[in-house]
Design a protein with these regions (language model features):
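Single, function-defining residue in the core of a domain
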Residues: 1-148
């Protein structure tokens, strides 16, 4: 587990060792943020097989879970083998979605997604979630949102 954490923090993941920050305090803050991001990736890695019953709320906000649900519909195929096999509110379901965004093909017969695939998926998800939030904000400003 520790080896995977360091792998995520270094070249193949967050590139922490390539930073040009020289001030100790700033470097410490960057390391803390990077470690949090790597820890989320490792949480997803542990949940990918659905052997834990953790809720997606341990790693994502309610708004992010809404975005994950919307993305899930676009990533699932037409056959049962191409569907997310986990309950949508579980961390395992979130892992399946994030892995698909990271380039995993979604088939159980394929090699399971690793930490780098999940890291790439989290990067893609962050961009999508940001765009989703901007879209909602713009709709509210324009008065185009009706809340029941």
């Amino acid at each position: 587990m520790i080896e995977q954490l360091f792998r995520l923090l270094k070249k193949q993941g967050l590139g922490l060792e390539d930073t040009q920050i020289t001030e100790a305090e700033r470097l410490l803050k960057l390391a803390a943020v990077a470690t949090k991001a790597a820890a989320v990736t490792l949480q997803l890695l542990q949940a990918r097989d659905g052997q834990t019953d953790q809720a997606a709320l341990v790693a994502f906000t309610p708004a992010e879970i809404d975005v994950l649900s919307a993305i899930n519909a676009t990533l699932e195929g037409k056959t049962a083998k191409q569907k997310n096999p986990h309950p949508l509110t579980s961390l395992a379901a979130a892992t399946w979605i994030i892995a698909r965004l990271g380039g995993w093909d979604g088939y159980a017969s394929s090699r399971p997604p690793g930490p780098i695939t999940l890291h790439r998926g989290l990067q893609a998800f962050a961009a999508i979630a940001h765009g989703f939030a901007l879209g909602i904000d713009l709709a509210f400003r324009a008065g185009n949102v009706c809340i029941p």
